[in-house]
Amino acid sequence: MSSLQQPIPPNSTLATTASSNQSGSNDFVKKLFLMLQEDSYKEVVRWTVKGDSFVVINTNEFTKDILPKHFKHSNFASFVRQLNKYDFHKVKISNEAKASYPYGEDAWEFKHPEFRINDAEALENIKRKGPTAKKSASNVTIKTEANNNGTQPTCNHNYSQLVSATNHLKEQVESLKNDKHSLYQEISVLERKYKTVVENIVAINTFNERYYRSMNVLINSIVQNGMKLPPLDFPPPVQLGPDSGIGSNLGPISSDTALPSISHHLSSPLPHHQQLLNRTIRPISSPIDGIPLVKLQQQSLGQNLQAPIGTPSAVPFSEEASSSIQAATPAPLAQPVAQPINQPPPPPPPPATQQQPLPPPPPPATATSQIPSAPPPPTQQQVGTSSSSVPTISPKSQGIVVSNSASPTTSAQISTTSVPNPKFHVLLVEDDNVCIQLCRKFLVKYGCSVTVVTDGLNAISTVEHTKYDLVLMDIVMPNLDGATATSVIRSFDTKTPIIAMTGNIEDNDLVTYLQNGMSDILAKPFTKDDLYAILSKHLLDPKENKQDNEPTVKKQKLS
């Protein structure tokens, strides 16, 4: 029989204490002391190293084996409550001390000032708490209520201040809501105005394009009919598409053949905008219609003229200038230039006469303009249909010639690079010369015919006039940004893939690009493999795209 189950000897101190103190019996504490003195449950419960407290190492084993045998408790919580009745308290272990605590993180350590190892006499000082504790608790409650009565006015004052501050915050929130609503309305008005401005800009550019076409056709007709023209100041057009055909259409432009405007495709054009778009240039069929302009020109130049005059410009043109520029014109290219769709062929040259030789027809590509770049491949031909140039008219008949120096800026230039038997026609909208050079080099290498424009307005006009297989669109450009240009293009062309080329690839920017109608994103800086991946994704058939993934092999498919 173990020592815990044996009765305590009558002459022992523990037995005497237990019999003499029935009201404040501490048998529970004595049983706990005797159990800790033994080593039978050392792995479950033991004294600490200092001996002034004990620790329950394994609460599960302690609850399962020890409590039912020695303390008649059904769970560990009731055992803890019993300890609390004898003024035992759990020792709190800080987080820093837990790292080096020798008994484990799940151990429970209890301590009483009079409960120490090998100190059985001190057990007499451990008494069970009596009902006086309840009285003291009630006294504490009474004192607390008295203190609360003293602090109630202060609490009421603080509460009133909080209510006042809350009401003030509510007023501020309502004011902010009203301001937000007003700002939203103002932004909506600004958006409508911005859309109207963009529509009018596009309409004005279309109107100017038709105007310059008509003037050019008129001057060509007069020159070919044998009439001599004086030196004229004729400005280059601000915007001409790649299929504008200046110099190739020698007949007058009537209202039936006027170019459609992009804004016809917009969802809600304004009345003033519609009137501006519907206005066409009336063809001038005889010199009589130009009499008022002739009189104005006679007053300014002091000459007797019988021909209509163009709008003034900063560059005058004379016979010598015409001869010099015509002499510097390069010979025709060996390879045919890729022409935009719906481009009428140039008419045959009229028969020459001895007295007044008629001018030969200008080539379909009105001027050659190249962005400075490295020497192109042998198959690369760069033919610019620059919107900042007017074609050379008649080298021997005092025609009108416009030099590229009349408009030195490159923001309005349009150039086309063709390859033999191109499989795809790509429009590159970019204003950076280095990016133009690299993209054009790779696109030509992959067998694509490339048209380059350098601003958003030219991009809109070019896409309206010519069908492209893919558009590479820069975002930050002069005149009109790429996102706005894409939104305008999507009003009349929803199928052509438009790829955004930008270094701004934040989530908000990407969402904006996609909302404006862009099909995909090509993040700058990119490699030729990235460019090829975009081309294969949007131009190749899915079967062809799956067969090869190497750019060197894919290049043969594109070509």
Curated annotation (Swiss-Prot):
Region Disordered, residue ranges: 1-23, 312-405
UniProt cross-references to Gene3D superfamilies, sorted A to Z: 3.40.50.2300, Winged helix-like DNA-binding domain superfamily/Winged helix DNA-binding domain (1.10.10.10)
GO biological process, one term: filamentous growth of a population of unicellular organisms in response to biotic stimulus
Extent of Pro residues compositional bias: 342-365
Stretches for region DNA-binding domain: 25-131
Assembly, per entry: Homotrimer.
Protein name: Transcription factor SKN7
